[in-house]
Amino acid sequence: MIDRINADRLAFVVHVGDITSGRGPCGDQWLEARQKQFARFKAPFVLLPGDNEWLDCKRSGFDPLERLAKWRELFCIPVKELPLERQKGKYCENVRWQHDGFVFAGLNIPGGNNNLGDDPAEHGERMQAVLAWLDESEALARQRDGLVVLMHANPFLVRPIGADGYQEVRERLRRLGETMPGKVLLVHGDTHRFRDDEPLPGLRRVEVYGWPHIRWAKARIERTGARLFEVELMPQ
């Protein structure tokens, strides 16, 4: 797939997380091998964390926060030929860049109910940083042509019982859709299917495939059409 993506002339490539399965492997060797694999991309490459590479590593006997620290060590690095801004402090995985008049904001919001049930303190501290980053990105985007929000989790999953780890970000997305209608695109993964819809008024959502469907989606800015982005699901 990397070879097929490299054959296209892309401004950048984004992976929205889950670079291993929900049961591992989670060790350093696996992550380092993925780092070398991603280095093959010709276009600037941005990686966001999914739950499989830190939260779910508890199933393999790892400490999730230690695995997230290792992820940061390997992947919080400069991105070639892309003016990438990282959030200051320990949440370096929250990123932002601008391209062709649009603001792109990448957030550490993983699946697994965003870790609310297992570690409410971690969830709360991280989400405070995430929401501050999203608010800053929104302020920038209001001076530009629009905003693209990227994360791993599907924030629209309905939980039958228990606390909702995505309520805060969903409310932010609702506000964005209401105040910037048609100018906000949400891209996420997590639930392993392709969707291109409008889950909230004014908010367009694209979910990309996950295992076992190994496919990628290509987006193009299209200012003259009814939608700002043309999204095409590419062959395997």
Task: Describe each model-derived feature in a short phrase.
Residues 25, 29-129, 196-227:
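Extended active-site neighborhood of metal-dependent phosphoesterases/phosphodiesterases
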Residues 3-12, 98, 105, 119-199:
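His/acidic metal-ligating clusters that form di-metal
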Residues 1, 33-37, 172:
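A short acidic, amphipathic alpha-helical/loop segment
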Residues 17-18, 50-51, 152, 189-190:
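Active-site glycine-centered loops adjacent to acidic/histidine catalytic or metal-binding residues
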Residues 1-28:
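N-terminal active-site segment of His-dependent metallophosphoesterases
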Residues 3-11, 41, 147, 212-215, ...:
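Acidic, histidine-bearing metal-coordination/catalytic regions of metal-dependent phosphoesterases
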Residues 19-22, 111-114, 154-157:
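A short, flexible beta-alpha/helix-coil linker loop
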Residues 20, 86, 184-188:
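Residue-level detector of alpha-helical recognition elements and their boundaries
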